[in-house]
Amino acid sequence: MGLKLSRGPVKEKSPLEFTRVHILTYFTTNSYLRNLVSKKRRRLIIGGYDLDMSYISDKLLAMSFPAERMRAVYRNPLWQVKSVLDMRHPDHYKVYNLCIEESYDPDNFYGRVERFPFDDNHVPSLKMIQLFCESVHSWLSLDPKNIAVVHCMAGKGRTGLMVSAYLVYGGMSAEEALEMYASRRTTNNNGVSIPSQRRYVKYWSDLLSFSKKGPPEVKLPQEHSRELLRIRLYDTANVDSVFFVVSELQEVPNEMYRPSVELARGCCRQFKKGYCRSSSPRYYISHVNCDSEEDEEVTDGEEPHLVVQMDTESSIIDEKTCLDFYFDKPVRVSGDIRITFYQKMIGSRLFYTCFNTAFITNGLLQFSIGELDKVGGNGRSISGPDFSLELLFGPACSKFGKFLSRDDLSLS
């Protein structure tokens, strides 16, 4: 004869816990907060759900993060996303997560999840863009019913960069892809708004060559290092010094994510009138066609193609306030570079920019205020009407380049 185990008394929820559960249930089923957070992003209303997701094409779906617990109050609830995808594309969807800051169990989507993580409001490596496009192409080629679901956190910037890159991989121009994403993802045609992210879509476009059939050939640039000599902020206002940090995305073995590693830091200051830094190279001759090993070999009878690169100094510059920093020892940079500017060394970021050294065509990179990233009120307050960030680099190929002093050139 067995023993009967009586059920213990059921523990009632405390009033506080009961209220908490009801509040959470209300907000996760009510889309008011999620509509508020999604701003101008297009939403999909289906099956009683109101979700922050948009079809960019019949094969590409962009959305914000599929969240659980409290985050589901203002992001797409994961269970609702899963329900909609299972209803519309059963067994034919794969999710691409671009977030480095958040993840979830891939089993929520039957294991069909792949991660390509990079920092929010920033850019991935060109290699990551290639791997992403090849993965999406491979998945979509398996079955005509397959679709790719791409998200970051808000489902706008990083998502827009990668979706636009895949549209370029499919044959569009960079501008066409960015415009298509903007019109399909937002109600105000403001899709990929961060200049560096748009810049990388254009970089990607330059690396593709198309044949009549099949995917394009990708020609990733070889490692291309340059020496950063000087940073100048041209036409500044209301400020006498600006701090900066130069960093580089560095590869980690067996990891997809490339962290940003600091290479140098300093402070751009206003030099007094008449200040002369004779040790700083102002002019040099550079061999411009030395991007590959074949170009570096110049025969005795062949004159190398030389170009004079100048850090221009003229009377008009003297009329503007410029903040300068010269590196005593040039900083060698290679690949994907990020330079961030601060009002103070700790906090108070003004703006930043990202670029790849393989796309530096001469010794001077210039960025207007509209070409810099996340420029807020503080950044605009120090910028004059002709503001420009100027980065001066050494010769592309030291084999044929030599520094010249100001007196070595006669200038008209």
Swiss-Prot record:
Disruption phenotype: Pollen cell death after mitosis, during the late stage of development, characterized by collapsed pollen grains, shrunken, with highly deformed exines and reduced size.
GO biological process, one term: phosphatidylinositol dephosphorylation
Record bears the keyword Amino-acid biosynthesis: no
Keyword field: Hydrolase, Lipid metabolism, Phospholipid metabolism, Protein phosphatase
Active site: C152 (phosphocysteine intermediate)
Highest taxon above the source species: Eukaryota
Enzyme Commission number(s): 3.1.3.48, 3.1.3.67
GO molecular function: phosphatase activity; phosphatidylinositol phosphate phosphatase activity; phosphatidylinositol-3,4,5-trisphosphate 3-phosphatase activity; protein tyrosine phosphatase activity
All residue ranges annotated as the C2 tensin-type domain in the record: 239-396
Expression sites by tissue: Expressed exclusively in pollen grains during the late stage of development (at protein level).
Cross-referenced PROSITE patterns: C2_TENSIN (PS51182), PPASE_TENSIN (PS51181), TYR_PHOSPHATASE_1 (PS00383), TYR_PHOSPHATASE_2 (PS50056)
InterPro entries xrefs: C2_domain_sf, Dual-spec_lipid-protein_phosph, Prot-tyrosine_phosphatase-like, PTP_PTEN, Tensin_C2-dom, Tensin_phosphatase, Tyr_Pase_AS, Tyr_Pase_dom
Enzymatic class: hydrolase
Annotated Phosphatase tensin-type domain residues: 42-211
Reactions it catalyzes: O-phospho-L-tyrosyl-[protein] + H2O = L-tyrosyl-[protein] + phosphate; a 1,2-diacyl-sn-glycero-3-phospho-(1D-myo-inositol-3,4,5-trisphosphate) + H2O = a 1,2-diacyl-sn-glycero-3-phospho-(1D-myo-inositol-4,5-bisphosphate) + phosphate
Regulation: Inhibited by vanadate.
Family according to the record: Belongs to the PTEN phosphatase protein family.
Protein purpose: Protein tyrosine phosphatase that also exhibits lipid phosphatase activity. Can use phosphatidylinositol substrates such as PtdIns(3,4,5)P(3) as substrate. Pollen-specific phosphatase required for pollen development.
Record-linked PANTHER family: PHOSPHATASE WITH HOMOLOGY TO TENSIN, PHOSPHATIDYLINOSITOL 3,4,5-TRISPHOSPHATE 3-PHOSPHATASE TPTE2-RELATED
Protein name (database record): Phosphatidylinositol 3,4,5-trisphosphate 3-phosphatase and protein-tyrosine-phosphatase PTEN1
Protein's organism: Arabidopsis thaliana
